[in-house]
């Protein structure tokens, strides 16, 4: 039975659209506002949906903005780029007739990317460049499973809820493959960077990460924080907690996982997530 599901997932990966053009263009943008601001404006102006999304976000704050240039000024270069990436990726998978709220899934992914960037800026600046994208895409395998083996994936969510177990364990039991493995195969199909593929594959299994362990640890940490803060819903009903391996990795950045010590970081994340309507 597992073989049947894995074949179905494999077939779906082959038939999936290529990496969205906008996302591919955003991957190529370096994190230098001075050099890339004009390129970002051109990407947005060529896409009516991106333009509308940015303007709607600004105007929902009670500010009146009608132009892309002004919208980027208000949002900031990084947030504007992040919104474009999230929007372009979510359009690849149009989920219909599902009992699962796909928007909450995307909200969780967006939240993890946002928190990963915040943590990187505060504790490990070398990871800032990849932090948001890695966080945004870490659970992309769930979206593939939801779209192509939706009924079985919903059963995995129900099993996670019934047992209070990690969702990836329920996926393994029912499908023979977890969302990390599916996501990593999609990353290979789309020729995404190895660092992103490793995050997808190992964010629930840090000891297996070798080349990009710090980035995997960062996203794992951000994922747990978002689950604690109830930012979106990734369908995982296990009690969020920090493994010894993750605690060791975070200790290298002098991150104290005691609740009181984490409070300032949590408040910082809450403020940013609330600003983006992700809680």
What are these regions (language model features)?
Residues 1-8, 244, 249-279:
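Terminal helices and disordered tails flanking the catalytic cores of nucleotide-processing hydrolases
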Residues 1-155, 167-242, 278:
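Conserved alpha-helical "signature site"
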Residues 163:
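Active-site-proximal region of nucleotide-activated glycan assembly enzymes
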Residues 160:
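A conserved active-site-flanking secondary-structure segment within enzyme catalytic domains
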């Amino acid at each position: 039975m597992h073989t049947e599901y894995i074949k179905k997932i494999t077939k779906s990966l082959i038939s999936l659209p290529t990496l969205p053009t906008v996302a591919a263009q955003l991957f190529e943008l370096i994190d230098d506002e001075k050099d890339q601001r004009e390129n970002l404006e051109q990407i947005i102006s060529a896409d009516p949906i991106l333009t509308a999304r940015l303007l709607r976000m600004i105007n929902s704050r009670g500010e009146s903005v009608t132009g892309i240039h002004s919208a980027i000024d208000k949002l900031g270069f990084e947030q504007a780029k992040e919104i474009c990436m999230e929007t372009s990726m979510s359009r690849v998978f149009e989920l219909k007739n599902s009992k699962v709220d796909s928007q909450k899934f995307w909200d969780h992914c967006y939240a993890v990317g946002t928190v990963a960037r915040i943590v990187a800026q505060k504790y490990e600046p070398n990871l800032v460049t990849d932090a948001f994208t890695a966080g945004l895409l870490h659970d992309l395998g769930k979206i593939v499973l939801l779209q192509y083996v939706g009924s079985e994936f919903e059963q995995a969510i129900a099993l996670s809820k019934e047992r209070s177990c990690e969702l990836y364990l329920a996926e393994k039991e029912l499908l023979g493959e977890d969302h990390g493995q599916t996501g990593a195969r999609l990353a290979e199909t789309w020729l995404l960077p190895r660092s992103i593929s490793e995050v997808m594959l190992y964010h629930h299994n840090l000891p297996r990460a070798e080349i990009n362990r710090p980035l995997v640890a960062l996203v794992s940490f951000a994922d747990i924080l978002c689950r604690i803060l109830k930012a979106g819903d990734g369908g995982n009903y296990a009690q969020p907690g920090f493994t010894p391996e993750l605690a060791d990795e975070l200790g290298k950045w002098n991150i104290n996982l005691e609740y009181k010590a984490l409070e300032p970081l949590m408040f910082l994340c809450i403020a940013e997530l609330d600003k983006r309507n992700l809680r």
